[in-house]
Amino acid sequence: MKRIMLFLATNLAVVLVLSVVLNIVYAVTGMQPGSLSGLLVMAAVFGFGGAFISLMMSKGMALRSVGGMVIESPRNETEHWLLETVGRQAQQAGIGMPTVAIYEAADINAFATGAKRDDSLVAVSTGLLHNMTRDEAEAVLAHEVSHIANGDMVTMTLMQGVVNTFVIFLSRFIANIVASNDDEEGQGTNMMVYFGVSMVLELVFGFLASFLTMWYSRHREFHADAGAAQLVGKEKMIAALERLKMSHESQLDGTMMAFGINGKRSMTELLMSHPPLDKRISALRSQQY
């Protein structure tokens, strides 16, 4: 219940902040909210603003959502190994030392998040630590470090911002046309039609746009695998992916899943955030990304 309330409060705060920003933009530019340019600005503020605020808050939100425990002073040999391995890989990749955390989960997984290359988070599940060899776990950590080094969080946020902007703009634009054709029904009915149509269209356009964002996510996974192979060797990365084929399905959600080592299965590859494991293994063996 606390987690739900925190989620709702956070989203309400984001909406209020973006509303204030939008009104300031309108006041400074003299732009009319009901104009086409005003609609586009509103879509951009909420489309990009929401995506970037989520990115800025991603470390804290990710840790809270999975109940992650940050390793500050290693309490055992495993935690010491995690810090030492991530630190060495971060130095090799030319990034700052990420915050390292462990979270309780049966699935073999890990994820990276954070707004900056030098202020990021790498978290691993207890399932990964219990079920993978050190070589396999090292490859998974290298995969996450590669995501950070490649700047995948920022590029995915930029893409999501563009997608959000067009989804909001097109939905509201079409809804406005539909509602304006019902002038004889009265102002109250027009507003209901407008919001009803815009909500339906946002769902439809958002679903269609997910094909693009998932394609890009799969594309970045191949490059993160390649980066991991450069850091620890191709055979270790292949061994880690082979191990994942026998694991539980990912329990991560949202951006954590997008930058995890293991994704959710889907009826169609087009809606998967990660390529099929066999394709990832084949790409590593052939070195074709």
UniProtKB/Swiss-Prot annotation:
Belongs to the peptidase M48B family. It is found in: Cell inner membrane. The lineage of its organism: Bacteria, Pseudomonadati, Pseudomonadota, Gammaproteobacteria, Vibrionales. Its cofactor is Zn(2+). The gene is htpX. Keywords: Cell inner membrane, Cell membrane, Hydrolase, Membrane, Metal-binding, Metalloprotease, Protease, Transmembrane, Transmembrane helix, Zinc. It comes from Vibrio campbellii (strain ATCC BAA-1116). This is Protease HtpX. GO terms for biological process: proteolysis. Binds 1 zinc ion per subunit. One of its GO terms (cellular component) is plasma membrane. Zn(2+) binds at residues 143, 147, 221. Its EC number is 3.4.24.-. The keyword Protease applies. The chain crosses the membrane at residues 4-24, 36-56, 158-178, 192-212. It holds the Pfam family Peptidase_M48. It is a multi-pass membrane protein. The active site is at 144. Its main location: membrane. GO terms for molecular function: metalloendopeptidase activity; zinc ion binding. InterPro entries: HtpX_protease (IPR050083), Pept_M48_protease_HtpX (IPR022919), Peptidase_M48 (IPR001915).
